[in-house]
Regions:
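Active-site helix of classical SDR
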Residues: 122, 161, 169
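Residue(s) in the substrate-gating loop at a strand-loop-helix junction
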Residues: 143
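A conserved structural motif in NAD(P)-dependent oxidoreductases
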Residues: 213-224
Length: 255
C-alpha cells in the first residue's frame, strides 16, 4: 500500500484516465476527492470504485470559475484537514480545424480549461500545502502532443496548451522544491479514452492507430494510472520536474 492515509484530489475524474487514477489511488490506500463539472457523472463514476462510500467523495467544480475553485479547496481542507496530492487531469479539446478558422470562443475554451483551470486549482491547493508545511505532490496529465505536432490533425492550440503544461511542471518543481513539494507531468500517447474511443469502434481505424505505435497496441487508462501511482508514492521521492511519456515508444519514433 503505497499511498496509505494520503488525501488526493483528481480533476476530470468522471471517466477514463481520471477515474482510473482515482481507482488506483484508492487501491493504494488514499482517500480521493473526484472533481468534475457534473456531479451526476461523478457520483455514477464514484460508485464503480470499491469502498467508494468511505474512500471517496465527489464535488462539482468548474475550473474556469476562480471563486468556485477556491471554495471547493476550502471545503476539502475543512473536511480532511490536508491535501497531499493533486492530479491535474481535467482538459478539453476542440474538433480538429485549421488555426485560422478558429473563433475566439474556441481559443478561450482551450486556454481557460487546459491552462488557466490548471493554474487556478494548483494555486489554491499550493496555498494549503504551504500552510500545512508537510510538503505535497502535484501530477499534471499532459500529452505527447506537447512535444510534437500531429500530422494531418489540426490541433495547434491544443498542442500549445500541453507544451505550456510541461513548462509549468518544471517551473513549479524548481520553485517549490525547498518546500518539499514535488511536481511531475505524465504525457500519454494514444490511449483508449476520450475522442479516441469512438475511432476504436471501427476495425480499420483501430488497425491504423495500432500500426503507428512502436508497441503495437493502444494504451489503456490504467497504463497512465500506474505511472501516476508511482509518481505519487515515496518510491519517486527524488523525482521532480520530470516529463514522463507513457506512449508505447511513440515519442521516440519517427512516425
Amino acid at each position: 500500500v503505497r499511498l496509505k492515509d494520503k488525501i488526493a484530489i483528481v480533476t476530470g475524474a468522471s471517466s477514463d484516465i481520471g477515474l482510473e487514477i482515482s481507482k488506483k489511488f484508492v487501491e493504494e490506500g488514499a482517500k480521493v476527492i473526484l472533481l468534475g463539472r457534473r456531479i451526476d457523472k461523478l457520483e455514477q463514476a464514484r460508485k464503480t470504485i470499491p469502498e467508494y462510500s468511505s474512500k471517496t467523495s465527489a464535488m462539482a467544480c468548474d475550473l474556469t470559475n476562480e471563486a468556485q475553485v477556491i471554495q471547493t479547496v476550502n471545503q476539502i481542507m475543512d473536511h480532511y484537514g490536508k491535501i497531499d496530492i493533486l492530479v491535474n487531469n481535467a482538459g478539453t479539446i476542440t474538433d480538429p480545424i485549421h488555426f485560422h478558422e478558429m473563433q475566439d470562443k474556441d481559443l478561450n475554451s482551450l486556454v481557460d480549461t487546459n491552462l488557466f483551470g490548471t493554474f487556478r486549482i494548483t494555486k489554491s491547493v499550493l496555498i494549503k500545502m504551504l500552510e500545512n508545511k508537510n510538503g505535497g505532490n502535484i501530477i499534471n496529465i499532459g500529452s505527447i502532443s506537447a512535444e510534437r505536432a500531429i500530422p494531418k490533425v489540426h490541433l495547434t492550440v491544443y498542442c500549445t496548451t500541453k507544451a505550456a503544461i510541461n513548462m509549468f511542471t518544471k517551473g513549479l518543481a524548481v520553485e517549490y522544491a525547498r518546500k518539499n513539494i514535488r511536481c511531475n507531468c505524465i504525457n500519454p500517447g494514444i490511449v483508449n479514452a476520450g475522442m479516441i474511443k469512438s475511432y476504436l469502434d471501427y476495425p480499420e481505424a483501430r488497425k491504423v492507430l495500432e500500426d503507428r505505435q512502436p508497441i503495437n497496441k493502444i494504451g489503456q487508462p490504467e497504463d497512465v494510472a500506474n505511472a501516476a501511482v508511482y509518481l505519487a508514492s515515496d518510491e519517486a521521492k527524488w523525482i521532480s520536474g520530470t516529463i514522463l511519456n507513457v506512449d508505447g515508444g511513440k515519442s521516440a519514433s519517427e512516425g
